[in-house]
UniProtKB/Swiss-Prot annotation:
Catalysed reaction, written as an equation: cytidine(1402) in 16S rRNA + S-adenosyl-L-methionine = N(4)-methylcytidine(1402) in 16S rRNA + S-adenosyl-L-homocysteine + H(+)
Keywords: Cytoplasm, Methyltransferase, rRNA processing, S-adenosyl-L-methionine, Transferase
Chain's gene name: rsmH
Family to which this protein belongs: Belongs to the methyltransferase superfamily. RsmH family.
Assigned EC number: 2.1.1.199
Protein name: Ribosomal RNA small subunit methyltransferase H
Native source species: Chlamydia abortus (strain DSM 27085 / S26/3) (Chlamydophila abortus)
Disulfide-bond pairs as recorded: none
Amino acid sequence: MSATPSHIPVLVNECLSLFADRHPKFFCDVTVGAGGHAEAFLSAYPSIVSYDASDRDVAALSMAKEHLEKFGDRVHFHHASFEDLSKDPREHVYDGILADLGVSSMQLDNLSRGFSFQGDDHALDMRMDVTKGITASEVLHTLREEELGKIFREYGEEPQWKNAAKAIVHFRRRKKIVTVRDLKEATAKVFPSYRLRKKIHPLTLIFQALRVYVNQEDVQLKVLLESAMRWLAPGGRLIIISFCSSEDRPVKWFFREAEKSGLGMILTKKVIMPTYEEIRKNPRCRSAKLRCFEKKFL
């Protein structure tokens, strides 16, 4: 996550401390956002001569370019997904790679992007890269009931996945689901009363599932993890920050398998989470989990 007036980068000090014993020269930030983590690394480590900053969100990348302008030619920007990056040849291997997964506060707060259930009259888009791909609204209208249920179950871990899918298919027969309000109406009777009384909005997991599917986040993450092992220099470190179990589980599993295979070692034997103080200042960071893997030296 990145720094703007409405957005605070998560676990910054913890990220920086993982390189305290190093003088990184080449760094890759595959989710630069508006540049919060990038600014911290470039300021803390003058040794970084090349910082590759990429993001699939063109709006975020534009903010990053403005925010990081003061670092001049130390920063190189790329509009790319993890999959796009995997196809491009690397000019050099990296001492550090950072990925801050999920949706940012910038994206949530911009209601026109459709990531938030607060923007009733806004379209259900949810694309990280608005230049390509299908929208969440299109997903809700083209997939069969069984397919929608699978998405809600696997990507959102929504207990009411079957009822939600059934309600949406029934609703779309008489009205197109275009806006956030439409989806709320379609699922109005799905959730049990105790879910409606909780602080967490009952549609949270449905929105999460749709976002993951629309942006192919599971596929993108798999590509990133596999590519990062090639991109890292010997002794290089990969930091992944995740915000839900569907993101954290594959990272945890991949790191374990990589360690067993002799590719390197897990530096975060115990996952790093935000302190109470950080959560107090930035409640949205409460579910963040940081894991770090070090590629073995030759």
